[in-house]
């Protein structure tokens, strides 16, 4: 039987994913728990409760955590590392709330718009993506990590130069849950590919017009019976993602249109962003995001002080 070497955890705001891992990163067991918002003030108790049986079988397993465990409301704040940052070097700056527990720091930069920007958790996903797509460690690369707060990361030879955060997912959720523009409360949020493509087309038709000037179309098109109530959310998603892509690509023009954009996300999000990038003439390659954080934690466990995951 393969021996357990360490425990890995991706501690998001709303969910905790834990894996018992072998030395090579293979997941032996997995489980879930409360996110950082719910675990606030009791991180140690939550972790110990979820991993008690794992530690009973092999005491003193080292733990590697990424995400919000290192935030200002986390277990112990892991200060942001400034960009440019060689991503492998995060393994040398782990925060330790207690012996045996290691929290990956986030990164900060001045983004292409000249404003401060931060990421926490995505740096570990980027490290994990290196294992699946080694070309990311060579030359200039543009990586898209879609989500609630989509990150666009600029890399050069494995060094994170800068990044840009676009709250595309959060804006979409706010519009769906708290606005009359997209849907009535009784209308479910479903994906309709045709309406999503229509939203992308609208984003491409007037690329210089801000998204704020076009959001009301989600309602007016429905009232004019040019858009179904069921398809309005997908149309809005297409408009938002299309505008995200259209606004971002010029900011990272130094990467060149010939270099594919790497998308690190779930299969469904990869497909949506790939369609948007194609609409604006960019090729893309997809990396499964579900396991990227754990692949990154596996790499960090090997790069950290000798023997920590032995």
Task: Kindly give the residue locations of the regions a language model identified.
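Glycine-rich phosphate-binding/hydrolytic loop that grips phosphoryl groups
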Residues: 275, 286-310
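Glycine-rich phosphate-binding loops at beta-strand->alpha-helix junctions
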Residues: 15, 257-276
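Short glycine-rich, Thr/Ser-proximal phosphate-binding strand/loop in the N-terminal lobe
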Residues: 5-44, 287
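Short beta-strand-loop/turn "lid" adjacent to the catalytic site in phosphate-handling enzymes
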Residues: 54-116, 157
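Short glycine-aspartate micro-motif
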Residues: 6-10, 62-64, 141-145, 262-263
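Glycine-rich phosphate-binding loop plus the immediately following alpha-helix
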Residues: 35, 39, 110-204
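Adenine-nucleotide phosphate-binding core of ATP-dependent small-molecule kinases
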Residues: 204-247
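N-terminal phosphate-binding loop and adjacent alpha-helix
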Residues: 26-62, 70-77, 181-184
């Amino acid at each position: 039987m393969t021996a357990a070497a360490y425990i890995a955890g991706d501690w998001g705001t709303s969910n905790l994913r834990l894996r018992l891992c072998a030395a090579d990163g293979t997941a032996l067991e997995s489980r879930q728990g409360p996110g950082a918002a719910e675990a606030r003030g009791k991180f140690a108790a939550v972790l110990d409760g979820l991993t008690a049986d794992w530690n009973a079988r092999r005491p003193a397993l080292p733990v590697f955590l990424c995400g919000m465990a290192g935030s200002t409301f986390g277990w112990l704040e892991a200060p942001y590392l400034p960009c440019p940052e060689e991503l492998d070097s995060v393994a040398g700056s782990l925060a330790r709330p207690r012996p045996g527990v290691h929290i990956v720091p986030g990164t900060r930069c001045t983004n292409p718009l000249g404003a401060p920007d931060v990421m926490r958790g995505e740096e570990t996903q980027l490290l994990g993506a290196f294992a699946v797509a080694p070309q990311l460690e060579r030359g200039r690369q543009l990586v898209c990590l879609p989500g609630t707060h989509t990150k666009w990361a600029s890399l050069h030879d494995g060094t994170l130069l800068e990044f840009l955060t676009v709250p595309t997912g959060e804006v979409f959720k706010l519009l769906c849950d708290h606005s009359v523009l997209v849907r009535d409360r009784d209308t479910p949020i479903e994906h309709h590919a045709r309406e999503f493509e229509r939203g992308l087309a609208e984003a491409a038709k007037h690329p210089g017009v801000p998204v704020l000037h076009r959001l009301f179309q989600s309602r007016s098109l429905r009232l004019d019976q040019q858009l179904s109530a069921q398809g309005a959310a997908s149309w809005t998603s297409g408009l938002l993602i299309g505008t995200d892509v259209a606004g971002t690509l010029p900011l990272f023009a130094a990467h060149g249109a010939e270099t594919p954009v790497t998308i690190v996300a779930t299969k469904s999000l990869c497909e949506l962003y790939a369609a948007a990038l194609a609409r604006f003439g960019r090729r893309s390659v997809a990396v499964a995001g579900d396991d990227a954080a754990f692949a990154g934690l596996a790499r960090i466990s090997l790069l950290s002080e000798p023997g920590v995951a032995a």
